Amino acid sequence: MTRLPILLLLISLVYATPFPQTSKKIGDDATLSCNRNNTNDYVVMSAWYKEPNSIILLAAKSDVLYFDNYTKDKISYDSPYDDLVTTITIKSLTARDAGTYVCAFFMTSPTNDTDKVDYEEYSTELIVNTDSESTIDIILSGSTHSPETSSEKPDYIDNSNCSSVFEIATPEPITDNVEDHTDTVTYTSDSINTVSASSGESTTDETPEPITDKEEDHTVTDTVSYTTVSTSSGIVTTKSTTDDADLYDTYNDNDTVPSTTVGGSTTSISNYKTKDFVEIFGITALIILSAVAIFCITYYIYNKRSRKYKTENKV
């Protein structure tokens, strides 16, 4: 008896011959039954399962045990006629209930004292239809439904009496008066802001000449500046010319603006370059290094004399 559940799990027989089919609609109840051929042996246990490997129930006489979430409310079991027939009723069919159901009989001979168990199984296919007409009936009858076609042609419409008039409007020419804007820039040498200063203030008026740019050729022009110094002793005007190219030279150019004489005094304006700062830094570093060298030499001489003096005192 302990080996019967193991034998049930090893059931995998598949028949090539077609088996009965039952077709029902969704919501109906389906009753599936099977009869055993061996009526002489004693039925030990009967079983129902759904392929591929879903066990529904195991029954021994009036005792029924359900598996895989199946309940008696969904599937009822009956075995009339002294276990010659086993029947199940599936209630309220759904699409998931469709499939192949297998009933099995486990039998033993009442005259045989051995533990030999005979086995029989039968399959039934349950088809659940979603429409009122059975799918099996459609396949067996060979009927096909083709869309209806209409051979009627629409009435011919005579368009000879119809005319369409299209009015095409010709737009008037659009005149776009474009004003010619001319920008005139007048440079006069007389436009000089004069600062009357008896205090010695100076006014610088620069009148740059136009720079011509044609076909990516840049022409660098000179800038003429006038420096006017007004003092109580007189007015001195100095003209200086600066080339734009000189603005990019930071090492080799050492320009000095000519001195301006005001009332007998001379003032010199110098432009310091990077080179000048480098020279100053070099001279300063040289002085510091010289001072360090002198300090080291002095310390060495003093230390040597101190050691010599200590040695003489010990002796």
From Swiss-Prot:
Pfam family membership, one: V-set
Residue stretches of biased makeup (Polar residues): 191-202
Gene3D superfamilies in alphabetical order: Immunoglobulins
Region (Disordered): 191-213
Residues of this chain annotated as glycosylated in UniProt: 37, 69, 112, 161, 254
Signal peptide bounds: 1-16
GO CC list: host cell membrane; membrane; viral envelope; virion membrane
Subcellular location: Virion membrane; Host membrane
Alphabetical UniProt keywords: Disulfide bond, Early protein, Glycoprotein, Hemagglutinin, Host membrane, Immunoglobulin domain, Late protein, Membrane, Signal, Transmembrane, Transmembrane helix, Viral envelope protein, Virion
Entry membrane topology: Single-pass type I membrane protein
PTM section of the record: Glycosylated; contains phosphate and sulfate-substituted glycans. O-glycosylation is required for hemagglutination and hemadsorption activities of infected cell membranes.
Virion surface-side segments: 17-279
Role played: Prevents cell to cell fusion by interacting with and directing the viral OPG040 protein on the host plasma membrane. The OPG185-OPG040 complex associates with components of the entry fusion complex (EFC) presumably to avoid superinfection and syncytium formation. Via its interaction with C3/VCP protein, protects the infected cell and probably also the extracellular enveloped virus from complement attack.
Family: Belongs to the orthopoxvirus OPG185 family.
Protein name: Protein OPG185
